[in-house]
Curated annotation (Swiss-Prot):
Its main location: secreted. Disruption phenotype: Flies are unable to jump or fly and walk slowly with an unstable gait. Occasionally they exhibit body and wing tremors while standing or walking. One of its GO terms (cellular component) is neuronal cell body. Residues 612-708 form the Ig-like C2-type domain. It is found in: Secreted. Residues 150-168 have a biased composition (Basic residues). The lineage of its organism: Eukaryota, Metazoa, Ecdysozoa, Arthropoda, Hexapoda. Residues 527-599, 712-770, 771-829, 830-892, 892-954 form the Sushi domain. Transmembrane segments: none annotated. A motif (Cell attachment site) lies at residues 318-320. Disulfide bonds join C569-C597, C643-C695, C714-C755, C741-C768, C773-C814, C800-C827, C832-C877, C863-C890, C894-C939, C922-C952. This is Locomotion-related protein Hikaru genki.
Length: 958
C-alpha cells in the first residue's frame, strides 16, 4: 500500500525535492530569507459576519503555487487584504455567557443512517458524535481542557482508521453507489432514552450564546415511515413554542396578535394536513381498510403497503440504511398504529390568559408545562430556538456549519451537508435522489428568517481539514474579522505557553530579512525601500495595510501569498539588475528569486569584467524611472545615452529593439567626454522610438535601458497640513514634489515623489512627526526620573534614592536630531570616613560590622576608667558624606573621694580634673588630723589622688 502511494505521488516527491533545494539556495543567499514565516497576533475576532454557506470547498492553488492538496467541508471564505498570518488560541469549549462567546460549533440535523445492521436505539446513538455523547442537559460546562484535546485527537484517529473497514462493509452490502458522505456519522440529534414524544426539546446546535443543547426523543421518529417529515413537524411545533414564548416574554401584545393572524405558507399547511391524515386513530384506519369491500378506491397509503418493493427502493434512494427493517414494518398493520402519535395542542394560538384577540383554544397540559419551562430559560436559549428557523428555499441549511464528515482519500466523493448531492471533482454534484418524486427543494421551504440576527454572536467556526498528499487531518477554523470570514487557519504541531494549539494560514507568506543593496522594491507602484538610518529609520513589520499606507518600510516584513513586488536598481544604467523585475510570493517562496544589482564600469574603475555603464541626459523635457525599471520620457524630447567605456580598449556597439528605426551613434564631441562616452542620440523622440537600447562592450558584456514615450498628468497636489512643507515642480511626467519637515520633526515617508507614466505619484504624501528621543533605559535600580519629555528640546531630570548620589549629569536634553545630550547617569552609594578611636577611649556601634559607613550609620564613643568623654558620645553619617559631629576625646579625671567622717570636702564635684586640690572642713568640735605632712590631696594626671583625705578628730582625741 505504501509503495503504491509513493508511486502515485512520485511527481510530488520530485517537486518537494526541488522545493528543498530552492530553500537551501535561498538560505545561502545573504540578501533574503523567504522561507521564514513570522507569527504575528491575529486580528481580533469580531462577531457580526453573515451566516456562511455550507459547501464542500477544494482549495485551488495559483498556477505558480505548489498545490497544498487541502480539502475542507466548510464555508466559502474571503481573505481581507490586511490579513497576513495568525497565531490564535485553540478554542474547543463553547462559552456559556453572551459576553464571552468567541467560538461556535453548529451542527445540522439529518436522519441519513449509515449502518443497516443497527437497531433503532443504536441507529439513534449513531446520530450522536463523540463530542455529543457526554452532553447532558444539566451539564453544560464541558470537560477539562486536556480531556477535550484528547477527545479531539482520538476522534480524528478513529475517523482515519475506520475508513477502509467501512468501505469494505458497504461494498458487501451493495452500498457502493451512495457516495462517501453517508459512511460518516451525522452530528445532529441527541437521543434522550428517558424522554418521550411529549418532552421533546429542540436539538441540532451548540450556539455561541450559552451552548444550550436540546434533546429530541428519536425512537418514534425513526419508527416513522417518513422520518424527515415527522421530524420537521415536530421541530416546527417546537419552534412555534419558542416564538410564542419570546412573544410573551417581550410583552408585545400587538406582535403576538400578528403572530396569531399570520397564515402559514401553503406548502407548510399541506404538510400539516398530510401528517394529520396519516395520524388518524387506529379505529379509523381499520375502517379505511374495509373500504375495498364497499367498492371504493383504496387510499395512497394502502397502495404503498401493497407494493413494499417500491417503498424499499424509495428508502434506498434516500440512503436509509434501515430499509430492510422498514420493509417488515410496512407490511404489518401494527406498525401504522405505532406511528400514529398525535401531538396535542395547537401552537398557533395563545393561552386564554394572554388576553389578546379572541378566545383561543387552550393548550394541552404538557404544552403549558413546556411553555413555562421555556419561559424560565435565558434569552440565549430563546435565540437558540429561533436559530433553528432554517432557510431551505435554495437547498441550504443555514444553521448547518462545519462538522466533520472527514475521510482519508482526498480524491473520493463527498456528500454535501446541503443534501445538494454527491460531489465529484470531475462531474460536480450528483443529486442523491433524482428519481424521488417526493423530494422537492421547494417543498422544504420554511419560514425565512434574517440569519444575521441569529448569527451576530458567532465569531469563530472550527472544522477538520485534509492537508498534504497523504490526507493528513488537522483541526482548522475560520474567524470573523471585520465582517468577513478569514481563513482557513490550520493547527500546527506546536503549542503555546498555555498548552493551546497554534494555528497558521494554509499558505505561507514570504519573509524578507533585508533588501539587497541598491535595489528598490515597489508594491502596487509604491516604494517599499527602507529609509536610511539618518532619516529616522525605525524597524517596522509589514502587512498589506502597511504596504498601502507607508512608502518606505524597513526590512523584516512579510508579503502575503499571491502578491508580487516590482524591483529595479536605484540608478538605472549605473547598476545592472540581475534577475527578473517582478517577483511573486508563492507559498513562502519567491518565484523567481529576488534579484540583485551589480555595479558597472564607472563604479569598478572601468574593469574589463564589468558591464558598461549608461549615462542619460534629457533635453526639452523631464523623465521618470518607473517601478518596473523603465525610463519614461515625454514626446519631442531629446535623449542622449552615453555608453561608458574606454576608447583605447575598443568601440562598444549600440543596438535597439525597433529594428526599423535609425539613430546616430558615435563618440561624444566634447573634449573631456570623447575618451569614454560612446553616445546614442534620439532627437525629437516619438512613440515609435519606444523600446530597449543595449550597449555591448567589445568583450560581449551588455547593459540596457528600456525607454517608453508617454504623456501623463498626475493629480494636483494640495497644500499639506502643517508642519509639512511642499515644493512642487509640476504635475507632468517626470516632475517631482519635494517634501520637507521643520527642525524638530521627522518625515515619515518619501522625501520626494515623481509623476509616473501611469498618472500616479510614485509615493503618497508623507507626514511629519515630532522627533522623539529614544526611550531611556534605567539599568540602575536606585535611579529614577522626576521629569521626562522625549520631544525635541525636551529634558530628562534624574534623582537617586536616599543614601545615593549621582555620578554624571543630573539632566539630559533631547536634541533636534533625536538623540540625548549625554549618557544616562548612575547612582553611587554615599559613605563616611571611618572615625579614629580617642586616646584612653573606645569606639562602638552596629554599623561598624557592615564595613561600610553609609548614610544613617551610627557610631558611639566611650572612655576608659579614670577618663571622661569630651564631645558627643554618638555621631551619624549624613547625606553629604560627613559626620554629624566631630569625634570626641577622653580626658583624665579623679573620682569623687567622698566626705570624711564629721567633715565635708570642698570643692564638691563628681569628677576632678588633673591638678585640682581638695580641702576638708570639719564640723564644730572637730579638727583636721594629718598622718603625715600637712598637704592637701591633689588630682594627678593618671586619675589618682596624691594622698589620702584628711580626717576630722575631736578635741578629746587630739
Amino acid at each position: 500500500m505504501w509503495s503504491r502511494q509513493r508511486m502515485r505521488h512520485k511527481p510530488l516527491w520530485a517537486l518537494i525535492s526541488l522545493t528543498v533545494l530552492l530553500l537551501v539556495l535561498d538560505k545561502s543567499n545573504a540578501n533574503t530569507e523567504p522561507v521564514e514565516t513570522s507569527t504575528t497576533s491575529e486580528p481580533d475576532a469580531s462577531p457580526g459576519c453573515r451566516a456562511p454557506d455550507v459547501r464542500f470547498t477544494i482549495v485551488k492553488p495559483e498556477a505558480t503555487t505548489e498545490q497544498p492538496l487541502a480539502k475542507f467541508e466548510t464555508t466559502q471564505i474571503y481573505l481581507p487584504e490586511d490579513f497576513t498570518t495568525a497565531d490564535v488560541e485553540f478554542v474547543d469549549s463553547v462559552p456559556r455567557h453572551p459576553n464571552e462567546n468567541h467560538a461556535a460549533v453548529i451542527n445540522p440535523y439529518s436522519l441519513d443512517l449509515g449502518d443497516d445492521h443497527l437497531h433503532v436505539g443504536d441507529a439513534a446513538a449513531s446520530l450522536v458524535g463523540d463530542d455529543d455523547l457526554g452532553d447532558e442537559d444539566e451539564d453544560h460546562h464541558g470537560d477539562p481542557e486536556d480531556k477535550r484535546l484528547n477527545a479531539n485527537r482520538k476522534q480524528g484517529k478513529r475517523r482515519r482508521a475506520g475508513s477502509g473497514r467501512r468501505r469494505r462493509i458497504e461494498n458487501e452490502n451493495g452500498q457502493t453507489g451512495r457516495g462517501r458522505g453517508s459512511r460518516y456519522k451525522r452530528h445532529a440529534i441527541l437521543h434522550d432514552t428517558e424522554a418521550s414524544p411529549e418532552t421533546d426539546r429542540w436539538a441540532g446546535s451548540k450556539l455561541a450564546a450559552e451552548g444550550d443543547v436540546y434533546y429530541v426523543h428519536i425512537a418514534d421518529i425513526l419508527k416513522s415511515r417518513e422520518p424527515n417529515r415527522e421530524l420537521k413537524s415536530k421541530l416546527h411545533k417546537l419552534k412555534m413554542k419558542a416564538r410564542l414564548n419570546k412573544c410573551l416574554a417581550e410583552g408585545g401584545k400587538e406582535k403576538c396578535t400578528r403572530l396569531l393572524k399570520k397564515k402559514p405558507k401553503k406548502k407548510v399547511v399541506e404538510k400539516e394536513q398530510t401528517l394529520k391524515k396519516e395520524k388518524k386513530f387506529p379505529k379509523e384506519e381499520q375502517s379505511k381498510e374495509k373500504v375495498p369491500e364497499n367498492g371504493q378506491t383504496p387510499k395512497e397509503d394502502e397502495l404503498e403497503l401493497d407494493h413494499p418493493e417500491t417503498a424499499a427502493a424509495h428508502h434506498r434512494r434516500r440512503g436509509d440504511s434501515h430499509a430492510a427493517e422498514l420493509d417488515q414494518r410496512d407490511r404489518s398493520p401494527r406498525w401504522r398504529r405505532r406511528r400514529s402519535t398525535e401531538f396535542k395542542g395547537d401552537l398557533g394560538q395563545l393561552p386564554p390568559e394572554s388576553g389578546i384577540g379572541p378566545e383561543p383554544e387552550p393548550l394541552a397540559d404538557q404544552d403549558l408545562k413546556d411553555l413555562q419551562q421555556y419561559g424560565n430559560q435565558s434569552s440565549s436559549a430563546r435565540v437558540a430556538l429561533l436559530w433553528q428557523r432554517v432557510k431551505r428555499k435554495s437547498g441550504k441549511t443555514t444553521g448547518a456549519l462545519s462538522r466533520p464528515k472527514g475521510g482519508g482519500d482526498s480524491s473520493s466523493k463527498t456528500t454535501s451537508r446541503k443534501d445538494k448531492g454527491i460531489y465529484d471533482e470531475e462531474a460536480g454534484y450528483t443529486p442523491i435522489h433524482p428519481d424521488d418524486p417526493e423530494f422537492d427543494e421547494e417543498e422544504e421551504e420554511d419560514e425565512e428568517v434574517d440569519i444575521l440576527q441569529q448569527f451576530t454572536e458567532v465569531s469563530e467556526i472550527r472544522f477538520p481539514g485534509e492537508i498534504g498528499p497523504m490526507g493528513d487531518r488537522r483541526l482548522c477554523k475560520i474567524r470573523c474579522v471585520k465582517g468577513k470570514w478569514v481563513g482557513p487557519l490550520c493547527a500546527t504541531n506546536e503549542e503555546d505557553d498555555n498548552g493551546n494549539v497554534k494555528f497558521q494560514p494554509l499558505y505561507k507568506s514570504c519573509h524578507v530579512n533585508r533588501i539587497p543593496s541598491h535595489l528598490l522594491l515597489s508594491y502596487r507602484n509604491i516604494s517599499v525601500t527602507p529609509i536610511p538610518p539618518n532619516r529616522g529609520w525605525r524597524k517596522t513589520r509589514l502587512s498589506k495595510s502597511t504596504l498601502l499606507s507607508n512608502t518606505e518600510i524597513n526590512v523584516g516584513w512579510d508579503l502575503p501569498h499571491g502578491h508580487s513586488l516590482q524591483a529595479r536598481c536605484q540608478e538605472l544604467g549605473i547598476y545592472k539588475l540581475l534577475g527578473e523585475s517582478r517577483v511573486l510570493c508563492s507559498n513562502g517562496l519567491w518565484a523567481p528569486r529576488m534579484p540583485s544589482c551589480v555595479p558597472t564600469t564607472v563604479l569598478t574603475n572601468y574593469s574589463e569584467d564589468s558591464a558598461p555603464s549608461i549615462r542619460i541626459k534629457i533635453f526639452n523635457g523631464s523623465h521618470s524611472f518607473e517601478p518596473s525599471g523603465v525610463m519614461a520620457v515625454p514626446p519631442h524630447s531629446t535623449v542622449l545615452m552615453d555608453c561608458m567605456y574606454p576608447r583605447v580598449r575598443g568601440t562598444p556597439e549600440w543596438s535597439w529593439t525597433s529594428w526599423y528605426m535609425q539613430y546616430s551613434t558615435g563618440w561624444s564631441p566634447a573634449q573631456e567626454e570623447k575618451a569614454v562616452r560612446y553616445r546614442l542620440s534620439i532627437k525629437n523622440i516619438e512613440n515609435n522610438d519606444s523600446g530597449t537600447f543595449t550597449c555591448t562592450s567589445p568583450r560581449g558584456l551588455t547593459n540596457s535601458i528600456a525607454v517608453v514615450v508617454a504623456t501623463s498628468t498626475c493629480p494636483q497636489l494640495t497644500e499639506p497640513l502643517a508642519p509639512l512643507k511642499l515644493r512642487l515642480e509640476g504635475n507632468k511626467l517626470g516632475q517631482r514634489a519635494h517634501y520637507e519637515c521643520p527642525e524638530g520633526f521627522r518625515l515619515d515617508g518619501a522625501w520626494n515623489a515623481t509623476c509616473l507614466a501611469s498618472g500616479n505619484w510614485s509615493s503618497p504624501t508623507p507626514t511629519c512627526h515630532a522627533i522623539q528621543c529614544p526611550r531611556l533605559e534605567l539599568d540602575d535600580p536606585h535611579l529614577s526620573l522626576i521629569e521626562l519629555n522625549t520631544s525635541a528640546w525636551g529634558r530628562a531630570v534624574f534623582k537617586c534614592q536616599w543614601g545615593f548620589k549621582l555620578t554624571g549629569p543630573a539632566q539630559l536634553d533631547c536634541e533636534p536630531s533625536g538623540v540625548w545630550s549625554g549618557p544616562v547617569p548612575r547612582c553611587k552609594v554615599i559613605q563616611c570616613v571611618m572615625p579614629v578611636a580617642p586616646l584612653n577611649g573606645r569606639i562602638g556601634g552596629t554599623s561598624l560590622s557592615q564595613r561600610r559607613l553609609t548614610v544613617g550609620a551610627l557610631v558611639t564613643f566611650s572612655c576608659n576608667d579614670g577618663h571622661s568623654l569630651v564631645g558627643e558620645s554618638s555621631i551619624i553619617c549624613t547625606e553629604n558624606g560627613q559626620w554629624s559631629h566631630s569625634p570626641p576625646f577622653c580626658k583624665s579625671q579623679c573620682p569623687y573621694p567622698g566626705d570624711p567622717p564629721n567633715g565635708l570636702i570642698a570643692p564638691l564635684k563628681f569628677n576632678y580634673d588633673a591638678g585640682d586640690y581638695l580641702s576638708v572642713q570639719c564640723r564644730p568640735g572637730f579638727v583636721q588630723s594629718y598622718e603625715g605632712p600637712p598637704e592637701r590631696p591633689k588630682c594627678q594626671p593618671d586619675g589618682r589622688w596624691s594622698g589620702p583625705m584628711p580626717k576630722c578628730k575631736s578635741y578629746e582625741e587630739v
